[in-house]
Amino acid sequence: RVKNFICKNSQIFVMTNEDIAWEELSKISADPPEARDKCIQCKRPVAVCWCPGLPKQRLCPESRIIILQHPAEVKRCLRTAPMLALGLEDGKCMTFRGKKFPLPKHEGLAEILNDKDTILLYPSPGAMALNKLDPVGTNGQRPYNLVLLDGTWPQAKAIYHASPALYLLRAYKLVGVPASEYVIRTQPTEGCLSTLETGALALSILEGNQQLRNIMLGPLHYLCRFQLENGAVTHQSKEFLIKQKTYPKLIGRRLAKQLRMLPEES
């Protein structure tokens, strides 16, 4: 042990490194640090609240969005599903959490999944383009129940394969997807969208109202603008960085496979 000689009140004390460590530890406050004030609506610290970007009056489309959310998504600090829920009237965006659906705890979900107007937004092999559907009100089309899987791509895929009830739903996919406007976050590939962007774009197609998308993206624009003004930088997708040979990390087999499936640029 290393010994240290400390003089206190004209007396010399011999202290080992362990003694010093315990003395320093005793100076640490037992009380937890004060938490930052949080917004009562979005639950984020007030300084980084994105609620000013929400519509002044919550939107009330005829269709509704059903989010099947992986439990791990709740821990993500920059998740966008709450933006979707807070931008729509109560009952127009319902969230169920789990890794398999439906379960007994998911009250009312089984009935929704059995509804003939319920559709799933998921790129399964037989999925058709969402814009091929009649918008609400066209040819007597009733309001849709739009099911979204919320999580990383591996998590969403796991939810789908663990939930046989989802196999029975009509599956659709977005085509001609615009670039993500979530510019402070790195997306896996070009064409990947956040949950908010996916829901907003899909809902605007089903409702036949393109203005819905612009209004619903308000909180995302507000968040990105704030972060960029305070030191954040614009992110490109992993796919873009890899193609430009500027991605700083080795890529995994899953992403490499996805990139091989993409069409070559002319």
What annotation goes with each model-predicted range?
Residues 16-33:
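Short Cys/His-rich Zn2+-coordinating modules
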Residues 52, 76-87:
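Histidine-anchored nucleotide/phosphate-binding helix
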